[in-house]
Amino acid sequence: MDLNQFISIRRELHQIPETGYKEWKTQAYLLDYINKLPSRYLEVKKWRTGLLVRVSGTSPTKTIGYRTDIDALPITEETGLAFESKHAGNMHACGHDLHMSIALGVLTHFASKPAKDNLLFVFQPAEEGPGGAKPIMESAEFAEWRPDSIYGLHIAPEYKVGQIAIKPGLLFANTSELFISFKGKGGHAAYPHLANDMVVAASAFVGQMQTIISRNIDPMDSAVITIGRIHGGEIQNVIAETAFLDGTIRTLSPETMEIVWTRLKQLAKGWEEAYQCEVTFHAGSDYYQVDNDPAETAAFIDFLKESYPKSYVPAKSAMTGEDFGYFLSGIKGFMFWLGVDSEYSLHHAKLNPKEEAIPFAIEVLIHFLESK
């Protein structure tokens, strides 16, 4: 099998990025490819805009899962690549095009040369939001083929091609989207005493919420509150009746996440009194921590040291969010970082991963799964 063909597949997928639960063209592309594979050992199920593909083993005693995400981000691409996005305003800026092409490469191998045990390939939509891992896990389709272990990867611009970074235990943080609205009383800019200015209220709240991190969280622990978007008012000479804050909370434990949320809501009650306004929290996506199973991770590290001794890099815990954590909360397994050596970070409009990582990852995963 020519592994370089999956670089071409990546380029085709890169041109049709679609956001969460809108991945219809992506699903159709994947189905078209999978339907051309030898079908003797394959079974395929649709789940919303995603897919579940089972490869029957030759003498199975268990099912091994492999998950890839398939959605893109609402980002306007600025790479200038010949195969850049054809969907204006959308981009595979988090590497899910590489993730899919790698999964297809591994699937292609086992469709013709099945392993001893069953393999389940999960093509999951909506990782970037609103979160597809938890609902697909709760589906009847997944329950019927539920794996005994499950693995996944994520590209990492900061590592070189050929490097794989992993650690037992916590790899990625708990992440919660944060949406806060402030409603007060608008008015003329010349009469501030007759209004309740929500730009002032929201701005003050941004600063005050950071004291939660510095004064309510154990300094030996870690948490981050980030406000990435502020919007308030409509015109420069009118006091804003409403204001909105959008951001994220990231913690290294569910307990710390609970502390942050409790304090935020307590602050909000004080703000309602102090600024004579209404403060409302709106639910967003939650991402459970990616907690690698120690035994499964140790086995993979041993495999790397034996078969790819120059590839293994000890990873550190990161504040990155990934809903693969929901899989690992109920199924043993792990996720690892795959080096792609890009000067631009994940979610950057100029992210351009080195494609040599694709055949390398396919080879590693095939050999690892064959060793199971």
UniProtKB/Swiss-Prot annotation:
Catalytic residues (UniProt): 69, 128 (proton acceptor)
UniProt pathway: Amino-acid biosynthesis; L-lysine biosynthesis via DAP pathway; LL-2,6-diaminopimelate from (S)-tetrahydrodipicolinate (acetylase route): step 3/3
GO terms of biological process kind: diaminopimelate biosynthetic process; lysine biosynthetic process via diaminopimelate
Domain of life, per lineage: Bacteria
GO MF term list: N-acetyldiaminopimelate deacetylase activity
EC number: 3.5.1.47
Annotated keywords: Amino-acid biosynthesis, Diaminopimelate biosynthesis, Hydrolase, Lysine biosynthesis
Catalysed reactions, as listed in the record: N-acetyl-(2S,6S)-2,6-diaminopimelate + H2O = (2S,6S)-2,6-diaminopimelate + acetate
InterPro entries cross-referenced by the UniProt entry: AcetylDAP_deacetylase (IPR023905), Amidohydrolase (IPR017439), Bact_exopeptidase_dim_dom (IPR036264), Peptidase_M20 (IPR002933), Peptidase_M20_dimer (IPR011650)
CDD domains, per database record: M20_Acy1_YkuR-like
Broad EC category: hydrolase
Pfam families found in the cross-reference section: M20_dimer (PF07687), Peptidase_M20 (PF01546)
Family of the protein in this entry: Belongs to the peptidase M20A family. N-acetyldiaminopimelate deacetylase subfamily.
Job description of the protein: Catalyzes the conversion of N-acetyl-diaminopimelate to diaminopimelate and acetate.
HAMAP family with a match to the protein in the record: DapEL
Protein name according to UniProt: N-acetyldiaminopimelate deacetylase
Organism in which the protein naturally occurs: Listeria ivanovii
